[in-house]
Design a protein with these regions (language model features):
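N-terminal Rossmann NAD(P)H-binding glycine-rich loop of SDR-like oxidoreductase domains
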Residues: 3-23
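NAD(P)H-binding glycine-rich loop region in Rossmannoid oxidoreductase-like domains
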Residues: 34-41, 45-90, 98
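Short-chain dehydrogenase/reductase
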Residues: 83-89, 126, 136-148, 168, ...
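Conserved Rossmann-fold NAD(P)-dependent oxidoreductase catalytic core, especially the SDR/UDP-sugar
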Residues: 90-139
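Conserved beta-loop-beta element that borders a ligand/cofactor-binding pocket
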Residues: 111, 148-172
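A conserved pocket-lining segment of Rossmann-fold NAD(P)-dependent short-chain dehydrogenase/reductase
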Residues: 131-135, 184-204, 208, 212
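Mid/C-terminal beta-alpha module of Rossmann-like enzyme folds, strongest
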Residues: 212-279, 301, 309-311, 315-324
Length: 324
């Protein structure tokens, strides 16, 4: 089977490309001029230089594809806002529209729980039906939502689409990719204070995300979406587990988000004057104020997906991160 993949040099994309190529599929990956393509080439994956913002640059690689998997996204909250909109909204529309015009059989969007803007304020877990929490806490969340809506417009015209919504993804390899950077920061004692300690978040192991995507391709009917969410824990519980597993020094303080936000009003000019980044951005605090708890029962029952919990996924991750 011929598969065209965007985001193939990213955390999820690279792991997925390896799995698909290992299963004997012909994987064609869209890569930017600055991307490190060596890991893909070592897997025998053909690379095509381009950008989701440039529809014409994808035509050669996408032509003749049986599946298009769109996993590319701009996650950099410190970059220009227009760049994120162009990648996550216009880019998603470009990939889907070209797939439709080329007559691609199936389309899989690798979205994110960011699409939902968070989960209910009472801490209960949301499902694929939502509800969506607005206003969105970050530009990334808003653009992921808008990008998905753009893709769905092409489904109305006949493109056979499925969507997966991974939660916070962790696990080797990639010490600074996915949510490994957060775990690594706690393991190294880089967070002196804990904010949003009682907010609930879903964590999913990278291998389970890849397995979920493969099972969607094998089993899911067109039009179906699946949360790949994993275990729901509070940030406080997560930090305690990291402390037990890796001796991570727990943060000395637990601070209300409102207090941190007020403090940054005075601290931000000092950080800027010293050429340093503040420990929290306004958008990060917006996210920490919300729950991100999601229920992946649909993937477990309809796809037969087994999603490991943190007790199984954290030990190898901590071992990997401590060694890097």
């Amino acid at each position: 089977m011929r598969i065209f993949l965007t985001g193939g040099t990213g955390y999820i994309g690279r792991a997925l490309a390896s799995r698909l190529a290992g299963a004997g599929h012909e994987v064609r990956a869209l890569v930017r001029p600055t991307s490190n393509t060596e890991p893909l080439k070592q897997l025998g994956i053909a690379t095509f230089t381009g950008d989701v913002a440039d529809r014409a640059s994808m035509r050669e690689g996408m032509s003749g594809a049986d599946w298009v998997i769109h996993a590319a996204a701009d996650l950099d909250l410190t970059g220009p806002p227009e760049r994120m909109r162009q990648a996550n909204v216009q880019g998603s529309d470009n990939v889907a529209s070209l797939a439709y015009k080329l007559g691609v059989g199936r389309f899989l969007s690798v979205s994110s729980i960011a699409y939902f803007g968070g989960s209910p304020t009472d801490g209960s877990a949301a499902t694929e039906e939502g509800p969506v929490q607005q206003p969105f806490p970050t530009l990334y969340s808003a653009t992921k939502h808008s990008g998905e809506l753009a893709i769905r417009e092409w489904a109305k015209k006949g493109l056979k689409i499925n969507t997966v919504y991974p939660s916070l993804v962790y696990g080797p390899p990639g010490k600074k990719e996915g949510s490994n950077a957060i775990l690594r920061g706690f393991l190294k004692g880089r967070y002196p204070a804990l904010a949003g300690a009682d907010r609930k978040t879903s964590w999913v192991f990278i291998d389970d995300v890849v397995e979920g995507i493969v099972r969607v391709m094998e089993k899911a009917p067109p039009g179906r979406g699946y949360l790949l969410a994993g275990e729901v824990v509070t940030l406080r519980d997560l930090v305690e587990r990291l402390h037990r597993l890796g001796g991570a020094p727990p943060p000395r303080l637990t601070l209300p988000i409102g207090l941190i936000r007020a403090g940054l009003v005075f601290a931000n000019p000092l950080y800027k004057a010293r050429g340093r980044k503040p420990p929290f951005s306004s958008e990060q605090l917006n996210s920490l104020e919300r729950h991100w708890a999601f229920d992946d029962t649909r993937a477990r029952t309809e796809l037969g997906l087994r999603v490991r919990g943190l007790d199984e996924g954290l030990p190898p991750t901590v071992e990997f991160l401590k060694a890097t």
